[in-house]
């Protein structure tokens, strides 16, 4: 901890507020709130913490704080600061998690539409629905039952919907406001859970039509009833009061929190939302931050009622959201809370199981690979592969695996500079020399294991440069392949000896992933270089096309094939003078 941090920690007040943690570049990396700033901020720098909190603390170089007059004010300020700074260690809910609604537009002749955007435009919104298909099915049913206008702009003649009986044709007929209002009220009644009443009305109309021997009309009513049954059957009833509500519950363990949200609309459980994130505050405070962001950042529909666990501050949530907040003690609402909590615990348990499985696949594999090679665990592995075709455009590539996982930010590509022709040994010497000269010069981390995707000659070439030129003692292993060019085993030691691994072991799979990845990376780089080389050769010796114009053409057309397909005018439009364009066009057509 630096001196400035110690001095600022000593001056923290015994008041509520927000704190902003900053890194070396003065970037805000975490925003938190506290009932007592002094206690909360100091806690980061004292005692033991789990790995993720240690990682956060290790990056803190400075902090600032803002005192507030209440805990609620601190919560609101925290939400605003998170929006402003977008800190990398804060929970940021995704913007794209929006649900579809059915909307009755506020127009002279209203329309029924499916939308994801809830606006304050006097339209009536119903939902959300679990997915757009559910919303469209319900709208399709309503279109059959209620003939509202369908066209966004009124045409000058009737459309197909009029002939299907699904539109009153306000484009050519004088439809009264009273008629529109009655239809809107019927749709509203249906969407608010009154479909059973509407079913009874349709059954009565069907019976009346049958008595009058109007069998076609009776069949229409029967079909409408069947559509209501099939559409509404898909939506399970959970509450009898038909109220819109969101049910929140959370579980936490090992420094992680899972929040489950059940969406209840018109008494139906239509969908749930699952969020999983690391904790840096007390559980109840993490939850308050989450629920504040949930409605503000995602623009979620705010229902009439929210159910939350007993462990959180109900009054603060009520003030924050301005809706009814309840903490039920028994009955169906309590059962919903318990069900959401049970799901949160299950989701956490599954996450930890996946983490353990992933660690077994990555860290565990690296540990056992070290045991098989009789070296320390190779937390950092660097692998090399050469690529050329008969010595042309020779390149090499290096990839990095850390704790059994690829770290693509540290991948490197090399154009071979000192070797001509197909000389894999010389190429390997050059690349290893360039890589580890730079590592030593810039004090970069050394690998625990170097893997060469090549035979004994390349392994010995790499080891010779490391030991005799650079004075480095890093284990070097080679990937031996079978006759189908698949990973067979490892070569290591002096002299080189094969190390056999079980083909179904995680350490063997790790080697396969490394070999496939370094080969892919090298090949893709070689293709890129070769493509540029072919492109350049086509453009050689054409007056008026120098290096600058070659690059421009490469960028414009992308490949020789596309340039050959181009017309003379296309080449001119790419910025080539007429005379040079004519020469190039003729050369391409030969």
From Swiss-Prot:
Q: Fetch the InterPro entries from UniProt.
A: GIY-YIG_endonuc (IPR000305), GIY-YIG_endonuc_sf (IPR035901), GIY-YIG_UvrC_Cho (IPR047296), RuvA_2-like (IPR010994), UVR_dom (IPR001943), UVR_dom_sf (IPR036876), UvrABC_protein_C (IPR050066), UvrC (IPR004791)
Q: One GO term of the cellular component aspect? A: excinuclease repair complex
Q: Where is the GIY-YIG domain?
A: 14-91
Q: Which UniProt keywords apply?
A: Cytoplasm, DNA damage, DNA excision, DNA repair, Excision nuclease, SOS response
- Could you say which protein family the record assigns here? Belongs to the UvrC family.
| Subunit relationships | Interacts with UvrB in an incision complex.
Its biological function? The UvrABC repair system catalyzes the recognition and processing of DNA lesions. UvrC both incises the 5' and 3' sides of the lesion. The N-terminal half is responsible for the 3' incision and the C-terminal half is responsible for the 5' incision.
Q: What is this protein called?
A: UvrABC system protein C
């Amino acid at each position: 901890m630096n001196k400035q941090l110690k001095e600022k920690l000593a001056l923290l007040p015994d008041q509520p507020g927000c704190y902003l943690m900053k890194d070396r570049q003065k970037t805000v990396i975490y925003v938190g709130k506290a009932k007592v700033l002094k206690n909360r901020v100091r806690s980061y720098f004292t005692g033991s913490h789990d790995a993720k909190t240690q990682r956060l603390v290790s990056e803190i170089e400075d902090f600032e704080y803002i005192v507030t007059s209440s805990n609620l004010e601190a919560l609101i300020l925290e939400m605003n600061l998170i929006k402003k700074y977008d800190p990398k260690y804060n929970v940021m809910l995704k913007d794209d998690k929006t649900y579809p609604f059915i909307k009755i537009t506020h127009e002279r002749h209203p329309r029924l539409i499916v939308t994801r955007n809830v606006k304050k435009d006097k339209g009536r919104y119903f939902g959300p629905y679990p997915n757009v298909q559910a919303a469209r099915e319900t709208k399709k049913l309503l279109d059959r039952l209620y003939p509202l206008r369908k066209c966004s702009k009124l045409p000058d003649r009737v459309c197909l919907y009029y002939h299907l009986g699904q539109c009153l044709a306000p484009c050519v007929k004088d439809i009264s406001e009273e008629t529109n209002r009655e239809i809107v009220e019927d749709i509203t009644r249906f969407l608010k859970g009154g479909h059973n009443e509407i079913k009874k009305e349709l059954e009565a109309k069907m019976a009346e039509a049958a008595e009058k021997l109007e069998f076609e009309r009776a069949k229409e009513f029967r079909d409408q009833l069947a559509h209501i049954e099939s559409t509404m059957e898909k939506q399970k009833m959970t509450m009898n009061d038909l109220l819109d509500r969101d049910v929140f519950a959370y579980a936490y363990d090992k420094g992680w929190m899972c929040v489950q949200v059940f969406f209840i609309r018109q008494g139906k459980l239509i969908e749930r939302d699952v969020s999983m994130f690391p904790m840096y505050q007390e559980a109840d405070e993490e939850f308050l931050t989450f629920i504040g962001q949930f409605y503000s950042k995602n623009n979620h529909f705010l229902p009439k009622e929210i159910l939350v666990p007993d462990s959180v501050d109900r009054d603060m949530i009520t003030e924050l959201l301005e809706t009814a907040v309840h903490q039920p003690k028994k009955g169906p609402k309590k059962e919903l809370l318990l069900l959401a909590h049970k799901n949160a615990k299950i989701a956490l348990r599954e996450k930890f199981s996946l983490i353990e499985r992933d660690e077994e696949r990555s860290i565990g594999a690296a540990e056992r690979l070290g045991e098989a090679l009789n070296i320390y665990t190779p937390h950092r592995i660097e692998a090399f592969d050469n690529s050329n075709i008969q010595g042309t455009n020779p390149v090499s590539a290096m990839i990095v695996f850390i704790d059994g996982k690829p770290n693509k930010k540290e991948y490197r590509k090399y154009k071979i500079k000192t070797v001509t022709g197909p000389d894999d040994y010389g190429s390997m010497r050059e690349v290893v020399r360039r890589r580890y000269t730079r590592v030593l010069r810039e004090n970069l981390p050394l690998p625990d294991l170097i893997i060469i995707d090549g035979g004994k000659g390349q392994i010995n070439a790499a080891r010779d440069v490391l030991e005799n030129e650079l004075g480095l003692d890093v284990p070097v292993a080679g990937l031996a392949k079978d006759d189908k060019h698949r990973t067979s085993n490892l070569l290591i030691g002096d002299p080189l000896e094969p190390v056999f691994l079980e083909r179904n072991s995680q350490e063997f799979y790790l080697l396969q992933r490394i070999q496939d990845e370094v080969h892919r990376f090298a090949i893709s780089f070689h293709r890129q270089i070769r493509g540029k080389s072919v492109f350049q050769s086509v453009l050689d010796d054409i007056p008026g096309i120098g290096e600058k114009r070659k690059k421009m053409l490469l960028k414009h057309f992308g490949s020789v094939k596309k340039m050959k397909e181009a017309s003379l005018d296309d080449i001119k439009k790419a910025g080539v003078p007429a005379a040079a364009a004519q020469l190039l066009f003729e050369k391409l057509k030969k």
